């Protein structure tokens, strides 16, 4: 359709952005009037999609010059039941508008100014600036348009196209240019703005920083510096890296392929991304180890309470690294319940060595490619987590934490655990192959540390490569110290509260631990301390806001006292005080015994209940018991049947026995309940109740021997938390018991038993510790 004067065209009113002839613009449609115009005139099937872009400069005024535009694309979509539109338009002509009666207007005059320019100096400046813009254009199409206008000497249109790329110009400046009278005026304005903004970064085309060629201001031609393209910059980075011969041949072969490719080829970007990854990896960058054992001991002592055995083992490891000047062959694995400081002690190791710390979470990973990357032939292929982490930390010898290594899963996509074998094997990891990188990378300088909650879930081959360091839960005394020395300070700092404003009494900490937490670590305890700090912050803020002009706090008692008596008012509905098993089940009937078990979150007391009824000696088990636990019941029953006459115990041969372990929804398994099951059956046979203040743990044999078990400290701490005072342990676990803190050993009456007879005797007599209480 030919645009003529006195035509009536639909109007789109805009308040930002100016469409110049020859330029394109995307216009989001927001106003109801514009939406009505589009739905009335543009949504119909028609090839004559022309509009007038009018510019609203104030509430009641529209600029006298508008732009006639062709609607190239119309986008429409629905969001929250509302229809939205967007227009892609191309500027055609300037136009004076008359009789603006929305939604249409009458075009009174079409302005196509392209007069000849007599000022040769101005032409030279304009052409030079336009060529610079074209040389750094993001598209070939735009460059061709620039050179086409130069060849055709369409200097007015050339000025329009150049100004359309100047993002630094404001709305009113662009309107002034749109309404300028004559080509000379527009060219002069274009040159003026070019000279004012000599930094090419101000253009929408985002010219690289290295281009310092400003537009000429004195009429003289200046030499435009050579702008290095992306491939040349990449080659410079690669030349600065010392590769091995094998890697160097592969890298430069791929670089040569890249240079011979056209940028439009599909493999160009894939190869470019691969080379950029290669150039960004720390092939030769290492941090210098600064291992001072005295400094390391200080860091470990200040950052962690208790765990003396663990800290000593870490110091031994650091001493070997210092003597050897190498970390090859030693991969530590901290195992224990959540929240006891496995990750933080790994950070302390990195700090004491002067190395960077990098953590990779492996929890829930099922795909081998997450570890070793995807092959480059796949769409959206990317390197594995190991290579990505090295790219992030920018050094090839960080302390690398493989967190939650026991949470790896095997599936149809391969075994992530198996993928770790090459990474953790000192004989192989000097040539670690990531599928995406596909060239050997030396990870032997990395100090690997793993963490796990349940070491039994690790595959044997992976476990064989790890040096296991067991970390147990904290006692009440240790938790109190941790809260006073670490948690409280951290939470006060986080909430911007001075130590002078709050005092957390020790008894309040004890109350939080005993009544609000049930954990081996201190995570829930820290959350409770955070809740107290938030309450204190609220009280302080309310006091300050009571008088906005006050420079000091109003009269209030400082520090704010947090005691055992008022802590329940602060934590409120977070109060989850549990009824202790001892109090709930006292007095114990015959056939009931307290056993001890250990889980990934710490130890717990496990009641064992047995009942009998007339029958034929059948055994019924309930409580979601595993195979090993069921076999322990049979062993205990077999020992009782074989020794009842010798020991003068009752018999259960003509009785049906029902054994139940409460919390039926929880899986239970393991051999350590053997002694507890034997005690429950003996109590049932003799009709004599067992002690209600004692718990027992240990595996039994058919000949009556008590065999060692694991998790001694966690089980003793669980008994202590529940108010039990006597614990019967296997004699074989005496060494683990003696390593426990003296305050725990003095508070608890621990009996070491070698046979089932010893266990039964300890579970039925009086406790000397209980007598003192």
From Swiss-Prot:
InterPro entries: AAA+_ATPase, ATPase_AAA_core, Lon_bac/euk-typ, Lon_lid, Lon_proteolytic, Lon_Prtase, Lon_prtase_N, Lon_prtase_N_sf. Keywords: ATP-binding, Hydrolase, Nucleotide-binding, Peroxisome, Protease, Serine protease. A motif (Microbody targeting signal) lies at residues 771-773. It catalyses: Hydrolysis of proteins in presence of ATP. It is found in: Peroxisome matrix. Its EC number is 3.4.21.53. ATP binds at residues 336-343. Signal peptide: none annotated. GO terms for molecular function: ATP binding; ATP hydrolysis activity; ATP-dependent peptidase activity; serine-type endopeptidase activity. Its main location: other. The active site is at 672, 715. GO terms for biological process: protein import into peroxisome matrix; protein processing; protein quality control for misfolded or incompletely synthesized proteins; protein targeting to peroxisome. Pfam families: AAA, Lon_C, Lon_lid, LON_substr_bdg. It comes from the Eukaryota. GO terms for cellular component: peroxisomal matrix. Belongs to the peptidase S16 family. ATP-dependent serine protease that mediates the selective degradation of misfolded and unassembled polypeptides in the peroxisomal matrix. Necessary for type 2 peroxisome targeting signal (PTS2)-containing protein processing and facilitates peroxisome matrix protein import. HAMAP family: lonp2_euk (MF_03121). This is Lon protease homolog 2, peroxisomal. It comes from Caenorhabditis elegans. The lineage of its organism: Eukaryota, Metazoa, Ecdysozoa, Nematoda, Chromadorea.
